[in-house]
Swiss-Prot record:
A GO MF term: enzyme regulator activity
A Pfam family assignment: Rap_GAP
Classification lineage: Eukaryota, Amoebozoa, Evosea, Eumycetozoa, Dictyostelia
GO BP terms in the entry: actin filament organization; cell-substrate adhesion; regulation of cell-cell adhesion; regulation of myosin II filament assembly; regulation of small GTPase mediated signal transduction; small GTPase-mediated signal transduction; sorocarp stalk cell differentiation; sorocarp stalk development
PANTHER family reported in the protein's UniProt record: RAP GTPASE-ACTIVATING PROTEIN (PTHR15711), RAPA GUANOSINE TRIPHOSPHATASE-ACTIVATING PROTEIN B (PTHR15711:SF21)
Function field: Mediates the deactivation of rap1 during multicellular development and is required for normal morphogenesis. Also required for the correct patterning of specific subtypes of prestalk cells.
InterPro entries the UniProt entry points to: Rap/Ran-GAP_sf, Rap/Ran_GAP_dom, Rap1_Ran_GAP
Name the UniProt record assigns to this protein: RapA guanosine triphosphatase-activating protein B
Species, as recorded: Dictyostelium discoideum
Region (Disordered): 304-339
Effect of inactivating the gene: Null cells have increased levels of active rap1, increased substrate adhesion, abnormal F-actin distribution, show defects in cell-cell and substrate adhesion during aggregation and vegetative growth.
Domain Rap-GAP: 142-407
Bias-annotated ranges (Low complexity): 311-338
């Protein structure tokens, strides 16, 4: 459960002495007239600011447009917005994590070019004829078009919270060798454990070439919606970094966050210190319903990729004396168990419009397909509610053609061949 916090709207009840919670989803208010308009990602991050734009009509994913800029005063961090017919995706890249190219620039240890960065995070574009757009009027077109299309792909952070933990500073320090069986069972239930190396489906901005984001993650698909989870306990862990900056960089970009809470005390909706986070889905196992689990899950060594570094003793309760393989999380969703139940509470920033489906009363679910489908639908509904009034209309053909029209228009003018 969430505690009351100014600036947030809670679904599933608050813990300020209420014995019954009130579902404040109002179907009649779930329309565009009452939705507060939120600035698009492009307008927030790129419009009117120093950046570069590249495009191509012929990539493996069809027409593609990429906006890229340096982050702050550093020349080592880059922020990208990748736009295709399928949707819009934010990607953050660091110079040290980029694929090393055998060029004069790399030998001289010069900073990578924008094209180096793009082809490193999107290797499939290496042989694509990307052109740089020099006509600044494209910004006016893109500010109307570049609004995330959430109904096809979603990336969501997934954090594990222990009994004594209260915010992301604590949760980002958790490692997979020191989590509960209930948490591992939930990962098993939520989706498929996939190897990131050369992963061909939606990767959610995770590194699929150099394992800089770990070796595995959790992926799921329902109908035509793909979901990639940024699972904090599966990301590399650096004992020398108390803030776990690399984990934070990735997760801080996610608008939708799932927290699996093993604790019994209420959590504050502002437990995630990121302006990007708009929706938090808090899932708490009801342990009275948990039977003896027969699922066997090993210990992941994803977070121990850095040679010579081991988890801090303060973060572990057991000592592993033998080398173990990655968790045996089933590659396919297991047969649901009715012995486990979950209580769900959802925190939304006040500016997030209402969205469905509403939580049931009481907000308790059995571990079954209905609960899994509810989570997917809630993430899709929440992510879609974050959109500004988009240039994309409700028809799928018009959604795709909006971006194609911009790329086609500027492919004949204001272009600089790379």
């Amino acid at each position: 459960m969430f505690s009351h916090c100014e600036g947030y709207r809670i679904e599933g009840g608050v813990t300020d002495g209420e014995t019954n919670w009130n579902n404040n989803f109002n179907q009649n208010n779930n329309n565009n007239d009452n939705n507060k308009v939120m600035a698009s990602i492009y307008k927030q991050q790129f419009y009117g600011k120093p950046h570069k734009t590249f495009m191509s009509l012929s990539s493996p994913n069809g027409p593609i447009l990429v906006c890229i800029k340096k982050v702050g005063n550093s020349s080592d961090d880059f922020y990208l917005l990748v736009c295709t017919e399928k949707g819009f995706e934010e990607v953050r890249a660091n110079k040290d994590s980029l694929q090393k190219s055998k060029t004069t620039r790399s030998f001289l240890k010069m900073r990578p070019t924008s094209l180096n960065v793009i082809t490193s995070v999107r290797p499939e574009l290496t042989k694509v004829p990307l052109c740089k757009v020099t006509d600044k009027s494209i910004q006016e077109e893109l500010v109307k078009v570049c609004e995330p299309e959430f109904n096809k792909v979603i990336k969501s952070a997934l954090l594990y919270c222990k009994e004594s933990q209260r915010d992301d500073n604590d949760m980002l320090k958790n490692i997979s060798s020191n989590v509960s069986q209930e948490y591992n069972d939930f990962l098993n239930f939520l989706g498929e454990k996939v190897e990131l190396k050369d992963f061909s489906k939606f990767n959610g901005g995770l590194d699929i070439k150099n394992n800089s984001h770990g070796t595995h993650s959790i992926y799921s698909q329902i109908n035509d919606v793909e979901v990639m989870y940024h699972v904090a306990t599966m990301l590399p862990f650096f004992p020398s970094d108390p803030k776990q900056s690399e984990r934070r960089k990735l997760i801080s970009l996610d608008r939708v966050v799932i927290i699996f809470n093993d604790g019994s005390k209420p959590m504050s909706p502002n437990c995630i210190k990121s302006k990007s986070t708009q929706i938090i889905i808090l899932i708490q196992p009801i342990k009275n319903f948990v039977g003896n689990s027969k699922t066997t899950i090993g210990i992941s060594n994803d977070e121990n990729r850095v040679v010579g570094e081991q988890p801090s003793p303060s973060l572990t309760t057991t000592t592993t004396t033998t080398t173990t393989t990655s968790p045996t999380i089933n590659s396919n969703s297991p047969t649901p168990s009715n012995k486990i139940k979950y209580r769900v509470s959802i925190s939304n920033r006040d500016e997030v419009p209402n969205y469905g489906p509403p939580l049931p009363d009481p907000p308790i679910f059995e571990k079954d397909d209905s609960f899994r489908n509810f989570l997917y639908q809630k993430m899709v509904g929440g992510a879609a509610s974050l959109r500004n009034t988009p240039a994309f209309t409700s028809k799928n053909s018009e959604k795709a053609s909006a971006l194609i029209n911009v790329i086609s228009k500027y492919s004949t003018k204001g272009m600089e061949q790379i």
